[in-house]
Swiss-Prot record:
CDD domains linked: TM_PBP2 (cd06261)
Record bears the keyword Transport: yes
Oligomer and partners: The complex is composed of two ATP-binding proteins (DppD and DppF), two transmembrane proteins (DppB and DppC) and a solute-binding protein (DppA). MppA can replace DppA as binding protein for heme and ALA transport.
Annotated PANTHER family: D,D-DIPEPTIDE TRANSPORT SYSTEM PERMEASE PROTEIN DDPC-RELATED (PTHR43386:SF1), OLIGOPEPTIDE TRANSPORT SYSTEM PERMEASE PROTEIN APPC (PTHR43386)
Topological domains annotated Periplasmic: 53-101, 158-206, 252-265
GO cellular component: ATP-binding cassette (ABC) transporter complex, substrate-binding subunit-containing; membrane; plasma membrane
Name of the protein described by the UniProt record: Dipeptide transport system permease protein DppC
Keyword terms of this UniProt record: Cell inner membrane, Cell membrane, Membrane, Peptide transport, Protein transport, Transmembrane, Transmembrane helix, Transport
InterPro entries: BP-dependent_transpt_permease (IPR050366), MetI-like (IPR000515), MetI-like_sf (IPR035906), OppC_N (IPR025966)
One of the GO BP terms on file: dipeptide transport
Record GO terms (molecular function): dipeptide transmembrane transporter activity
Length: 300
């Protein structure tokens, strides 16, 4: 009898760690795994672009203007994806453009997330007049088209990568404020918060130590989706001439510079467009997987 009991104890399943549980639910979404693999590849290219890119992104080959990709007639293996109207290698510019796009996306998400979380915690925890003021400002910002608002801000401060990133941060801010506030309103009346308040915990400890960790799941999902929105909006600003300025290798600017050659040299617009499309799609797929892995309702 004791032998049977011992065997049962030994064969009991080992509980998963939080990281193992997260990966268990995340990998069930095959699209999210594909998106993660693509993002890792793009991140690798962005980090090591200096070493793996064939040429400097600003280097011009005047004897190979609008050269087609290597597999087309007239193409060359020296320029695998062809060249643009001034002889710059398209593949090299795409690789360096990945670095800029990911950097801007990261900057926008981090800044908007930090400011949005702080404002959302204040609005949800204190309520009353403070909540009304913050949320009415947020409502006004959400009433304006996001890209139009970003264009106006960049036009005021001048077109540049930094100003475009700050404008996109301002545009993305309301989403994090509302999401954080909604999560705080759910948590603020729970027993553990009340007990902590009775024990003498101050407002700062309540907001950032007790409540904030329980609001992370929806914020992580929104940050993933916000990353793709930042890349897409940055490309749109670059396309309109309000983002990165030539000759900076940025995907939207690459499209804007060669738009007049779209019919005669399809590769100069197709490859930057595909880079934007696939990167945005990959982050959106990752966002779906993160939601599946972090939302308790979807785990059931």
């Amino acid at each position: 009898m004791s032998q049977v009991t011992e065997n049962k104890v030994i064969s009991a399943p080992v509980p998963m760690t939080p990281l193992q549980e997260f990966w268990h639910y995340f990998k069930r979404n095959k699209g999210a795994v594909v998106g993660l693999v693509y993002v890792v590849i793009v991140l690798f290219i962005a980090i090591f672009a200096n070493w793996i890119a064939p040429y400097n992104p600003a280097e011009q080959f005047r004897d190979a203007l609008l050269a087609p990709p290597a597999w087309q007639e007239g193409g060359s293996m020296a320029h695998l994806l062809g060249t643009d109207d001034v002889g710059r290698d398209v593949l090299s510019r795409l690789m360096y453009g990945a670095r800029l796009s990911l950097l801007v996306g990261c900057l926008v998400v981090v800044l908007s997330l930090i400011m949005g979380v702080i404002l959302g915690l204040i609005a949800g925890y204190f309520g009353g007049l403070v909540d009304n003021i913050i949320m009415r400002v947020v409502d006004i910002m959400l009433a304006l088209p996001s890209l139009l608002l970003a264009l106006v801000l960049v036009a005021i401060f001048g077109p540049s990568i930094g100003n475009a990133a700050l404008a996109l941060t301002f545009v993305a801010l309301p989403h994090y404020v509302r999401l954080t506030r909604a999560a705080v309103l759910v948590e603020v009346n729970r027993d553990y918060v009340t007990a902590s308040r009775v024990a003498g915990a101050g407002a700062m400890r309540q907001m950032f130590i007790n409540i904030f960790p329980n609001c992370l799941a929806p914020l992580i999902v929104q940050a993933s989706l916000g990353f793709s929105n930042a890349i897409l909006d940055m490309a749109a600003l670059g396309f309109l001439g309000m983002g990165a300025q030539p000759p900076t290798p940025e995907w939207g600017t690459m499209l804007s510079d060669v738009l007049q050659f779209a019919q005669s040299a399809w590769w100069v617009v197709t490859f930057p467009g595909l880079a934007i499309l696939l990167t945005v799609l990959a982050f959106n797929l990752m966002g779906d997987g993160l939601r599946d892995a972090l939302d308790p309702k979807l785990k059931q």
